[in-house]
Each structure stands twice: as C-alpha cells, then as structure tokens.
Amino acid sequence: MNKIQHKSQFWAISSEGMNKVISSSFPAEMKEAIASVDAQGDDKKEVLRDMLSVYMTQRQRMTNDEGIAEVHLHGPMLSDASPIDLAMGSTSYEEIREDIESANMDDDVKAILLRVNTPGGTVSGIEETYEAIKSSNKPVFAYNEGYATSAGYYLIAPAESIAASPSSMTGNIGTVLDMWDFSGMYENMGAKRTLMTNEGADLKGTMRTEPTDSQREFLQNQLNDMGDQFHARVVESRPDVDEEVYRAGWYQPDAAAALGLIDFKGTLKDYKSMIKSAIDIRTQ
C-alpha cells in the first residue's frame, strides 16, 4: 500500500487504485501517453516516472558544485520506493547510496554535502545507507534546510560537521510504530473479523487489532531494539550529544547546537564557502 498526497487529499492506496486516480485526475494527453507505454519492468517504471515528473516535483539527483557533490535527502525516505512515491517527492535509500557511490568515484568531487529536508523514513534500508555515508572515502558534510529529524538525523550523524538553517528543526531521535484498530468501525458496519492462526503463532495479526499483552510486549521489544540501534549510531558519531536528545524532542538551531546535535547555524551559501575553504586547505 502506498500513502500518497494528490492535490489536497491523502490516500492509502494500492497500485491498481492509483492507476484509477491517475486515469481520473490527469489530462487526456497524459492518460493516452500512459496507456501507450509498451515497456515492461524497470524500463516501464522509468518511463512512467518521467511522465509523472511533468506534474509533480521529484527529488533532485546528485550535482557537482565546484568540487562539492550535493546529495539531496528530501521528503519521506523509503526502501525500494515506487515511481509514484518518488514522483510525490519521497527519497529512495537506494538512490542516496547510488549518489554517494557516484560521488566517491568522481575524481572531480572533493567533498560530499548532504542537503537535508526530511521528517524521517522507514527503518528498512536505513542502516545500509548510514554505512554508505560513514564509509565514504571523501569527506561528508550535512546541511539541514528545514527538517533533519528521526531517520534524517540518523543518516547525517556521521558527517564531519552539521550546519542548520536558522529556521530549521533537528532531532526526534527514536523509533515509532503507528497502529490503527478498526474493529469498532467494522462492528458498526455489521462486520466482525475472525483471525485464526496455527497453534503457537500468537504474534500473528499484531498490526490489525488491539494487541494482546504478549503481542504488545513483542512489539515494544522490537521498537526498543531499533531505538537502541539509533541511539548507538548517534553516540558512535557524536559522542558529546546531550542525553536529553534521546527523549525524541526536536529543536531549533540554537538549542540543537547547545545539545550537540549540530555544529553551526547559518545559510547554505556560508556553509558551502566554509566547506570549499576546508577542501582548499586539504588539497594544498
């Protein structure tokens, strides 16, 4: 299921349902173009992505600005994001890793700048992306353009330095699981759901109804394990961060700097000038 935004509405929708949304929402020439696509698999994804980009804003891929490779972490970050997800402004973990790899292979690149404006992302895919950033053979810097929260901060923690826009928010270190119990709604509709599992598989169905005590304990342990890993990565990268940040608050730049989450507050232009000066010193 894909959670997407189109105009002023939100949907939780299947791929088949999304095809109907596209069919009813886009101009006739767009519908005809989509119907005419005869490519399959990844080729078809690329064609559809290009078409959708005419109507929607996609994440910008890596660019090289005078030796600084700019890698964008914008919108919700997902593993194996669909063309619709990407067309709606999400970021694919796979694309981030590809951009980091490309920057490391480019002799004209002297440093990597992560430009961040993301509320976070899925746990799946985050560790591989963190390792790609941490193991970069070129220095990595990070700039928070608006939000560097949750998974967004997880990924920029290993940067050599982190700067933030004066109007940005940083932090929200922790993991969350959001569950909805629709049983009451279905009962009002006259429908009652019965869930059966094989004996001993009592943790099945934990995401669809009010969890039992054992199911809740299992889910809490999963969250704690993921939260502990997040905590460990921040400590590993920025050992002087104040323990207060692990309550998952998010902070404006002055508070974020005082807590050790960022190093500088300023404009992107000033931060890039500082990076270029640092590169010049290292290459002399």
Regions found by a protein language model. Name each.
Residues M1-Q284:
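N-terminal organellar transit peptides
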